[in-house]
Amino acid sequence: MTEKIRECIRQFLQMEAAGGILLLVFSVGAVIFANSPLRDHYFSFLNAPVIIQFGSIVELNKPLLMWVNDGFMAIFFVLVGLEVKREMLIGAISSYQKAIFPAIAACGGMIVPALVYWLVNQGVPDYHGGWAIPMATDIAFAIGVLVLLGTRVPLALKVFLLALAIIDDLGAIIVIALFFSHDLSTKALILASIAIVGLILLNRFKVSNLIAYVVVGIILWVSVLKSGVHATLAGVIIGFCVPLKGKNNSEPLVEMEHAIAPWSSFLILPLFAFCNAGIPLSGLGMEALTSPLTLGVTLGLLLGKPIGVFLFSYLSVKLHIAKLPEGINFKQIFAVSVLCGIGFTMSMFLASLAFGGGDGHLTAYARLGILFGSSVSAVVGYWLLFVTTKENANQ
């Protein structure tokens, strides 16, 4: 592994860890606000209308919550697209040998949680739409837990989690594209296609000016928003179209990644957590705790994730499809697989897509399951990592 890649991973881990702490603070703050005398102000804040108009051509009128989920999260997904592309070209999944082990683990971590959710909710048709919620891994929280253990965690284990989470994000993107698009508009899709062609041409000619990608990207985002396809996919496309190498030895991808990453970690994701984690607990009794929806999400994260990630990882090695990275063992892989049950922001995002956001009881049940499953996964995962990395601490 080159020094450049090591430095890139180090900076990424530090940024995600700090962001994870902020996510926790803003999430707790959201729950406090939603259950305090200020709850009416909290929900009024979320539903406050925000209007952006460009003459008579475009008018976007949405509540603040939707601007956060459709707008700010699109910027986050630009970062996801940039990270996935970078890792595919020069990083942790840049070759078959590097990618196959975390890729198989990620597949298990998506398939088994969805299956667990479906088994719990198969008798309740109204809940079927939430099957994708426990598939996601929140890389900020997961990396944050890893960083708490410092140097006792092997670099190979950190790289494994990073690669797995990135492939997991890619899976979430595919799920959003295939299952959460509706009422498609042909005109908007044509305009979006033209914008995509524009981005591809910018990439083809290795244009280094990031403003060009921002301008065409905004056109793409508005078009996708109007098309019926979820607007965050525009962010991913923008990220994929920024070239790794530009003219005059410039690095547009790295430049844009460094420009967006602090905003994503310290503003966008904390704001998303604050707007989506506020669950009014006063109206939730045993019915909420024992609901198949809540249980399906909780068990999907707590059991489905570790079983899927570990089982697929173990079988891939035993069947000689992949090799266990040097310096780590299956006990540590299992500990990381439990950490993958921290779904949080990505799971919250998928819940808002599945059940329409807002403060409806389906969304509240899903969020309750996400908070419980993610919290227990974080605590148990930390303890398992602490136990399984004792030898590293003694060296």
UniProtKB/Swiss-Prot annotation:
It comes from the Bacteria. Its main location: membrane. InterPro entries: Na/H_antiporter_dom_sf, NhaA. The keyword rRNA-binding does not apply. One of its GO terms (cellular component) is plasma membrane. One of its GO terms (biological process) is regulation of pH. The chain crosses the membrane at residues 18-38, 64-84, 100-120, 129-149, 160-180, 182-202, 205-225, 226-246, 266-286, 295-315, 333-353, 368-388. It is a multi-pass membrane protein. GO terms for molecular function: sodium:proton antiporter activity. It is found in: Cell inner membrane. The keyword Endoplasmic reticulum does not apply. It catalyses: Na(+)(in) + 2 H(+)(out) = Na(+)(out) + 2 H(+)(in). Keywords: Antiport, Cell inner membrane, Cell membrane, Ion transport, Membrane, Sodium, Sodium transport, Transmembrane, Transmembrane helix, Transport. Na(+)/H(+) antiporter that extrudes sodium in exchange for external protons. Belongs to the NhaA Na(+)/H(+) (TC 2.A.33) antiporter family. HAMAP family: NhaA (MF_01844). This is Na(+)/H(+) antiporter NhaA. It comes from Histophilus somni (strain 129Pt). The gene is nhaA.
